[in-house]
Amino acid sequence: MLAVGLLGLSAVIVPAAAAQPFACTAGERPLRFGFYTHFEPVSYSDSRTPGSAGFDTHRGYEADLLSALEAIEGAKLAFSRRGIAVWNGIWLLPAGSEFDIVGGGITILESRTRAADGKAAVVFTAGHIAFRQSLLVRKEDANRLARHGKLSGVDRVGVLAGTTGEARLLEITGIAGAAGVLAVGTRVVTPRGRVVADGGAGYVIAAAGASPSLAGRRQIRPASAGLPTVIVFTDDAEMVEALADGRIDAVARGEVGNRAAAREHGNAFAVTALDARAETGGFALAARNAALAACLDRHIGWLTDGGRIGYSEWFGDASVFMQRARQAAVGKR
């Protein structure tokens, strides 16, 4: 599973014939792990302000999973963690020189493995968490907006730019096709003015990225009067606040984040419109470090018991991954 001489980690990765087959590194330096700071409870920091005390303090589901990886005897895994506040293109950062691994509730998509030139840039580990898209609505609207199909032209739906929540909402409602191409006549409000989609490849909003002309988009107004207006946010807390004060009628986002917001706001919100399509989240590494990804897969597979332990189990007992790590250390593996 392990390889020699991976570019950028050649001093860290050990050969396949090494005496410790579980070792992912030579233990000479920590792996530089960048984590998204705004996805509570999956991946977040003590402080959302870059440069402040606590910004690089990793919390949540993925933080505990990483700590358990570090605790596996013989794996030789250590992570130096740094917070990342900007979501857009976060999965491509390991292709550069600043990070070895990046996480933050990133949905695994083949389209996210390629750079802008179409060349392979990153690989993902196997999935360690499952997501489903959903709507977060005010409790009094739960019946009216029980399904995506009930959204109408009077509704305004919030999304986070560049997420699967945005891309999937556009696809489900028919504002865009499966590849993210916007329907003819769709109007997009950007800082540079309004653009109108012609149904071609120059007007795309997908989870892996969007057309340059749509950068910084603020609103997506469908050509059909019967479809909802999409309000684009860059901060999830601001988006939930907009739902609370009535500026929008729903938040299109993964179930995990929406249920966390519903819990935080007591009886004010409800989660509806659970998507039948499942998504899986993993960690991103440079394509040249595929062997490291494979080694991580081995240990993540143990910690998650082959996918049987995930977010729900962690939410019930946040020590579940560390318990598995200790079992590995005492030879129960």
List each language-model region with its residue ranges.
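Extracytoplasmic small-molecule ligand-binding "clamshell" domains
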Residues: 19-110, 232-233, 296
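Extended ligand-binding regions for polar small-molecule ligands
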Residues: 22-24, 56-59, 63-73, 137-166, ...
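Periplasmic-binding protein-like
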Residues: 36-39, 126-142, 190-195, 223, ...
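Acidic, polar ligand-binding/catalytic clefts
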Residues: 76-151, 267-277
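Short helix-initiation/N-cap motifs at beta->coil->alpha
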Residues: 78-95, 143-144, 180-200, 223-241, ...
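A ligand-binding cleft/hinge motif common to bilobed small-molecule-binding domains
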Residues: 88, 105-117, 200-223, 237-277
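Flexible hinge/capping segments at coil-to-helix
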Residues: 126, 137-157, 172, 178-187, ...
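Ligand-binding clefts/hinges and TM-proximal coupling segments of bilobed small-molecule sensing domains
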Residues: 160-180, 184-189, 266-273, 300-333
